[in-house]
Design a protein with these regions (language model features):
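C-terminal motif of bacterial Sec signal peptides marking the signal peptidase cleavage site
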Residues: 28-29
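Active-site mouth of glycoside hydrolases
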Residues: 37-304, 315-317, 328, 337, ...
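N-terminal secretory signal peptides that target proteins for export/translocation
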Residues: 1-15
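Sec-dependent signal peptide recognition
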Residues: 16-21
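Catalytic His-Asp charge-relay segment
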Residues: 331-333
């Protein structure tokens, strides 16, 4: 009897999933056959009107302290509404009103209905705490071989040892596989296209990223690090951990640009009421004039309704970046900052963002399994205890701040801006 009921339940779930995917395909076909419903890049007037109707936007790149990566955050078995509520309340208590949150294509592939339900639940909790959400679809940073199921334990004292790319290298480096992602993008955007709880859509984090710390370690260092979480690397299996070979930076931008172009089309065809963006981030180039940028960066700027960027540099660097980006005459969001040892601090940077009404999303809220209190160099330098200056993050898990002075500064700036 138990087997029969279980079998019937599984059959019903499969039928529901197939029905939902069928509806998505109908919507996709309707959009393709009705080109007048396809949106285009927002005009400068439209995006400025939209932006000026919002308060100063301040928040974090949010993930619960119990999650090592996007998959652990969103999977049904580890999705934790109570902890989300607790940690979002903490951010709201210091005046934060928005968060940037990463999705993953594998979550859609495994259980699209459940994934959408969990996104909806997250948005419900966020809205209850006065927080709007910037959702991120794809990410070119950290581990290129994501897998569903139980996620690895953090490598002790190592920055972001479990974060995963989306899509993984298997799909990214096979252009013919890119179209498999269309239902993911259109399914999510169509579901929430008119949802005021979503601030905007961030299509691709650090598109074409190179120089990732996890990729540049030696074989000996890889053996040492992975041994700490019970993974033995040998000559026979090293190819599975040689990330530079799996994720070759020499050709990555070509494949990323191909996927990003398709993603922009898919989102525009879904005609969301929210604007879209993809961030510019390369630290070793100027970001203007446009003609000097790579083909990928030119496309990023030209396809974004609102310009977003990452800045982990000093006050001087931020001011120079703002000068360059103001050439594009669109509102600005800094979607990643804070690297205290790198002179990217709340004290130096956040007042600049407030003065210029630039949206500000620091990396990390509550210190946890991502280990982002440790710097990037922890991949190649041994730490045995937390650094005196945290790299990212604001709070301990008990709700105590890393720095009382930082908390007072954030509170003062957000309260002044939103009077």
């Amino acid at each position: 009897m138990y087997y029969e009921l279980s079998h019937q339940k599984q059959k019903l779930f499969t039928m529901k999933k197939l029905f939902f995917l069928f509806i998505c395909l109908i919507l996709i076909q309707c959009q393709k056959s009705n080109p007048e419903k396809t949106s285009t890049r927002w005009s400068e007037e439209k995006i400025w009107n939209w932006y000026n109707n919002h308060p100063w936007l301040v928040g974090t790149n949010f993930i619960t302290s119990s999650s090592i990566n996007q998959l652990e955050f969103w999977q049904e078995e580890t999705f934790d509404p109570e902890l989300i509520e607790k940690e979002l309340k903490l951010s709201a208590s210091i005046g934060m009103n928005t968060h940037r949150v990463f999705l993953h294509d594998l979550l859609w592939e495994q259980d699209s209905i459940g994934f959408l339900d969990r996104i909806d639940k997250f948005l419900e909790i966020s809205d209850r705490n006065g927080i709007k959400t910037l959702l991120v679809f794809f990410d070119d940073v950290w581990h290129p071989v994501p897998n569903m199921g139980k996620q690895p334990e953090p490598i002790p004292h190592v920055h972001n040892s479990g974060w995963v790319q989306s899509p993984g290298a298997k799909i990214l480096y096979d252009s013919l596989s890119h179209n498999k992602l269309e239902s993911y993008i259109k399914g999510v955007v169509t579901k929430f296209a008119d949802d005021s709880r979503i601030l905007a859509w961030d299509l691709y984090n650090e598109a074409g990223a190179e120089g990732i710390a996890s990729h540049d370690i030696s074989k000996e260092r890889a053996i040492e690090l992975y041994e700490k979480i019970g993974i033995e690397i040998t000559d026979d299996n090293y190819s599975s951990y040689n990330l530079n070979d799996i994720d070759p930076k020499s050709i990555k931008k070509t494949y990323t640009l191909s996927l990003l172009k398709k993603t922009v089309e898919w989102v525009r065809e879904s005609n969301p009421s929210q604007p879209i963006t993809t961030g510019i981030y390369a630290w070793d180039i100027d970001w203007a004039p446009l003609s000097d940028l790579s083909e990928l960066d030119q496309f990023i700027i030209n396809s974004s309704d609102i310009i977003s960027f990452h800045s982990y540099g000093s006050k001087k660097d931020v001011l120079e970046r703002l000068k360059q980006l103001k050439n594009y005459n669109r509102p600005l969001l800094c979607t990643e900052y804070i690297a205290r040892e790198n002179k990217s601090t709340f004290e130096d940077v956040l007042p600049i963002f407030k003065e210029n009404k630039i949206g500000a999303y620091n990396w990390g809220l509550v210190s946890g399994k991502t280990n982002t209190i440790y710097p990037w160099k922890s991949w190649d330098s041994t730490y045995t205890a937390p650094p005196n200056k945290w790299h990212h993050d604001i709070f301990y898990q008990n709700g105590e701040p890393f720095s009382n002075d930082e908390i007072e500064l954030i509170k003062n700036l957000t309260s002044q801006a939103n009077k």
